[in-house]
Amino acid sequence: MLRTLVWGLDEPLVAPVIGRLHDEGVFCIKTWIVNVSERNKPVFAQREGIEIVEDKFDLNFHQEDLDLLPVWLDEKIRPYFPVILQNFAREAFYFRTPYYEYMNIIQLWTRYFYTLLSRNQIDTVIFADIPHDGFRSVLYPLAQAMGVRTLILVPSGPFGTFAYCFSIEDYGRFADVPIYRTPRSKEAEIRQEYKKELYYMQGKHTPKQRSTLQYHLREISSPKEFIARKKRIFQRSLQKYSNLHEFIFKKIATTAMDYYEKRQYQINVTRCIEKNVDLNCKYVYFPLHLQPEMTTDVLGGIYYDQILAIEKLRAMLPPDWMIYVKENPKQTKLMRLDCFFKRLRLIPNVKYVDRSIDTYALMDHAQFVATITGTAAWEAISGGKTALIFGRIWYESFPGVFRYHENLRAEDIASYQIDHQALEQALYRYLEKTVDAIFQRDVQEVMSNFDAQENSQKLEKFFRFMISYMEENPLQAAGKERE
């Protein structure tokens, strides 16, 4: 029986399914890491092995709590530290921590997760999404290095489905995972146009919604939940400070710095923005990702640095081609400080175009679209426009998508003709390795005619299938190095 650590899958749509499979002996959950807001739900209240990462933010461990890593293991995961560091930079609890202190924090979390894996003899870790944020980005390479199999569930691709893979490196290729289902032919039909209805850009997820009265009324529509959430945030904040004096001093300093950075960001945007662009010249359209986000911090690899991608793009283009860069509508000052704009201004023939300029007009007239892992490339190839990507993404093996490499020629990308039928066939093959169910509440909220019972049955069927597959096909290296 698989001895499993589950991270997430704690929402009401899926947690009862996971709990039931454990209780029936389908697999054994030794550790279940759940969100602090879910800890008192009935499915977790009486269950052993529940871990709340938020409770350990202050890192006040005792000597007997943590085991030391073997030397070979420390050496094996150390090359992954830049990715871990990039992900810790977005953790609010450790925000503005000096680099050297981040290294201490990472070492402590590494020992914590190593102890969980080794003492519980974990042989499988299940992640509900690509491992990101500081904590999961520590656990993932640690598990991989120890020969512990990882199963990653990724809500991506067509709405209402999720993909699965055994490693981040296989995401987009899906070469290592079995086919799960036979999609309906209608699922693989692609409208030959750019525009897509994206749930995360609609309703409560839209950029402007957070500042509206309606948004704030929704926030307090459940007073008990609202108060509990604010209380958790306040208590977590207090963990960061050793006394009231430190709390007041750092809060004042942080507030002042935030104000300055927001103001400076607006100044830089105003200074760089181009409101008039020529859609008839030769150019490549590069829509920026929202940052910080998993899609760049993890799936982007070294191209979490989006300016680096633009610099590489500039180097491969003919000198007279322009690059039109457009900011993400949800972007704030984070990862957009002064030197971001200084670097951008130093790249020849690059225009930072106004957010009001229509995305699809920019896409339609471009030679091709370039992005790290963005939906823009999927929109582009759907409408017949080729795309250049710099990271890993679910559609990366589809016709018309080019992964950046040093010898790639811009003219070859621009001249490639997408066969729409071949594109639909590629989507069909992708869908064979997806599940037509959901496990996230925010997706369910925007679904019409959602059937919770049917969804639960589909989830259970998939987990039974995948657990059986992993038991019948154990990792060759599982546990060997640990022994």
Question: Model-found features: residue ranges?
Answer:
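A donor-sugar binding/catalytic signature common to diverse glycosyltransferases
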Residues: A128-P131, V154, D354-F402
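Conserved nucleotide-sugar donor-interacting segment of glycosyltransferase catalytic cores
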Residues: Y112-D176
